[in-house]
Amino acid sequence: PARDLGPMLAQASAELLEGSSGLRPPAVLLFGGESTVRIAGPGRGGRNQELALAAMKPWSALKNAVLLSAGTDGDDGGTGVAGAVVDCHSWDRLCALGEDPNRLLDDNDSGSAFEKLGDQVLTGITGTNVMDLQIIVAGPKPVRPQRPLLPG
């Protein structure tokens, strides 16, 4: 499930940054496949945004890494966006907007979370589908995505 995979990717990133994985930053980790989402709430969002939202809390401790999770077809769960980006500031930024990230995750409302943050990945429909990609960029110093993530 996407909500389990997000924290697992945060753990893999922590091990990379600590040097306990056999790799050292700077490095890029690439993952592919398609996770699942058990829909229990009324929210909107797809598996990539749910994965990113689930990674958000543990990612708070990762000052030198950023995660992008996106569908290669450009449409994550029928939302019109490909996915989302998470960095160490995402959790605090969402809380500062008056949102409860745990409630949003419970409501399957990851789309609203990343729309409010402005951290959705917008590609438009790509005309291809080679599953989902998770890209982790880990550096020797803090990594911060530039906004906008992609031109609209």
Where are these regions (language model features)?
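A glycine- and small/hydrophobic-rich beta-loop-beta segment
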Residues: 1-53, 57-61
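Internal helix-turn-beta structural module
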Residues: 53-152
